[in-house]
Amino acid sequence: MSAQILPSILVPLVGLVFPAIAMASMFLYIEKEEIN
């Protein structure tokens, strides 16, 4: 059961969460550079 459900949850999670974290970190980095 778990072996078939896990990929269908993990793939969208990685596909959505990882880019969101990357965008957020880049946004914060740019904001930090502009303030200084």
UniProtKB/Swiss-Prot annotation:
Looking at the UniProt entry, the stretches that span the membrane are 10-30
- Keyword annotations of the record: Chloroplast, Membrane, Photosynthesis, Photosystem I, Plastid, Thylakoid, Transmembrane, Transmembrane helix
The way it spans or sits in the membrane comes to: Single-pass membrane protein
> What are the BP-aspect GO terms?
photosynthesis
Can you list the GO cellular component terms from the UniProt entry? chloroplast thylakoid membrane; photosystem I
- Compartments (UniProt record): Plastid, Chloroplast thylakoid membrane
Q: Does the keyword Transport apply?
A: no
Q: Matching InterPro entries, A to Z?
A: PSI_PsaI, PSI_PsaI_sf
Does the record's keyword annotation contain Zinc-finger?
no
Entry superkingdom: Eukaryota
Q: Per its UniProt record, what Pfam families does this chain match?
A: PSI_8
Family per UniProt? Belongs to the PsaI family.
Q: State the protein's purpose.
A: May help in the organization of the PsaL subunit.
- Descriptive protein name: Photosystem I reaction center subunit VIII
The root-end lineage is:
Eukaryota, Viridiplantae, Chlorophyta, core chlorophytes, Trebouxiophyceae
Q: Which gene encodes it?
A: psaI
